[in-house]
Amino acid sequence: MQTGKFPKQVHYFYMRQQSDLKSASEPRARGRILDLFAHKPRERLTPAEILRRAGFARDELQLIVDALRGLCRDGQLVRLKKNHYALPDRQHLVKGRVHAHPDGYGFLIPEDRDMDDLYLNRREMRRVMHGDQVMVRVDRKSRGGAETHIVQVLERGQKRLLGTYDELNGKGFLVPMDARIGAIPLKPGQVKPEKGKVVAAEISRYGTAMSPPEAHVVNVMGDPDDPEVQAQSIVFRYGLSTSFPPEVHREASQVSYAIAPEEVAARTDLRGLPIVTIDGENARDFDDAVYVRKQGDRYELYVSIADVAHYVAAETALDQEAWARATSVYFPDRAIPMLPEALSNGICSLNPKEDRLTKTVCIEFNAKGEVVRSRFINSVIRSHERMTYTNVRRVLVDRDPEVLERYKELIDQFKLMEELALLIYEQRKARGNLDFDLPEAEIIFDLQGVPENIVRAERNIAHRIIEEFMIAANEAVARQLTEKNLPLLYRVHEGPDREALEALAPFLLSLGYRLPLKQERVAPVEIQKLLESARGKPEERVLNRVLLRSMKQAVYQPENIGHFGLASACYTHFTSPIRRYPDLVVHRMFDRALRGDKLKPNEREDLVRYLQEAGKHTSERERHAMDAEREMVALKKAQFMMNKLSEEFTGFITTLANFGFFVELDEYFVEGLVKLSSLIDDDYDYYEKEYIIKGRRHGRKFRLGDNVRVKVVRINAFRSEIDFELVSTGNGKTSKR
């Protein structure tokens, strides 16, 4: 597990109001170096030349070397021969990620989205692996062609590998799970695995043009058919740490559960309010609690969030570990927390009937659900009840007598919450909020932890209440910190590229829908109208899916460009500091706002640089966690389907590709592949622009959303693969197999 990568000067902003930062901080050194190259873009400079020209002190050479290493790692500079450094674009260099093909060649996916992918031949691919971040040089040939040469490996995408053990001529090999990575020789070790066993390995040496890579076994995990081995394999491959370092545990154990009287006296005491938490049945950490009151035609919403920043100070081992993880990871049957349990389930969790320190946002709304004003306070609360979404639904919708009696003192409070939440939602809907309303699967486990059913996850009025209140709080914090001119880590969501929507237009037209593309940018409300027009119709699910795929991913950054999906001009993440590091960053800025801190120019410059790094790091860790979560869900679905071999199910086509199409089963929300090679009645081709697969001789077509009947023919749970065979289509045509 990596630790926080920023020097003390960066976290200093959260520790004191005044700053006496010296110029010898790495973030500022990077800025000075880039400024030098901005004025001398064609130059190739050594560290010594940079020291002299940029005005560094003689004893700052090591600082320059460290800063150059970071700039090269980020692709902002490139190291050339004889220890010279230069700007990449002046050397005709392109930065990107390697995407390998099982046949040995690969492609560079440029960071610049306007560039086409670049082909990497087998010779170049010997030096790299799938996922590596590299810098390449594109050499134009006299006949109009081009050759791509790898100049520098910036970051390795593979450090740990998982696969099965095999032998050839007495020598051990790792056959990686990922088919895009070839077999890798293993160094002889003390432990010799059995053939076919799952082994975890670390790369000892990366490949060169002359020699293959080499790895060594770090753990023999067991049989590939063992469900727990399959689950642990995902945890290993994603480098997720299931334990905390001793120093982190030591700091966590020293946190006092007692709240000092002077701390309570310094805060607003909200313990008299009937504040409650509302979470899922299996939730163990509670970071938000809510309360609503109404005076006349005005509503006042209190959103109280666990004051994690009070317990996790900057520069500590706790903070560094939280930075490194950046997020908690949630699997269907387990979780890997960002903070140790002593904090996440203990003093930071808003457990019922216990005093807790919180940060509270108080928002006043008018009768239409429009925000009138908001204010921030550091507070102390005592949650009156640990409510679940199900029990709130039983109060508001089912009117369950037993539940009504149990929570009779809170019934009016829940009704008021529902009233306000629906008003807020109507305001968001009016400005163009996107609601794709795609069903989510919930995996049900038996007492032995084996998946026994997959059902549609419930979403009720209680979910709507919490969602609306959390969005309102996040917007209020973002607005107020922005108005105070404080740098902030925004949660931003860029709108879809016009090209992506133009490519989608013919398919939408085939369903009878048209998306206005007259303007350069499509407004959220236009996509919202499209979603609304398909509501309740047969094509709703496929239309929602293709539109969602055209969307970009939300990220964290200090530049505010708004949030397209929420149709919000100013948004951040504030409400989940137990499980998200960006929220902890925002909490620290919350404290600066309460103190009325003013930033000096050099403080602002360094803080913005820190927020840029924090945004990049936490966005990457979020994507990493989401990938791991998706893969674990796919594994559990494959495990569930193991006893469904040879059974037939109805479903619909969700994805088309040149090798087949994916079908999601109506009953279980499980997706599997129908390979084109299994369709023996014709030879089929994939027409990407038309969104169809079509037979060459008979013209039979498969489209997104088509209803089909399939048989389960193969399952490889270790690889989370499920293969279907087509039985018939919605028009009654059957496979001739």
Residue ranges and their predicted role:
Residues 200, 205-207, 233-240, 247-681, ...:
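Electropositive polyanion-binding surfaces
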Residues 1-2, 13:
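The catalytic Nudix box helix
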Residues 11-302, 309-358, 391-394, 691-693, ...:
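Charge-lined substrate channels and their catalytic hotspots, especially those that engage the 3′ end
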Residues 115-121, 181-186, 669-686:
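A short macromolecule-binding patch
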Residues 7-9:
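Phosphate/ribose-recognition catalytic cores of enzymes acting on nucleotide-derived substrates
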Residues 2-5, 733:
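Short, low-complexity interaction segments enriched in Ser/Thr/Pro/Gly
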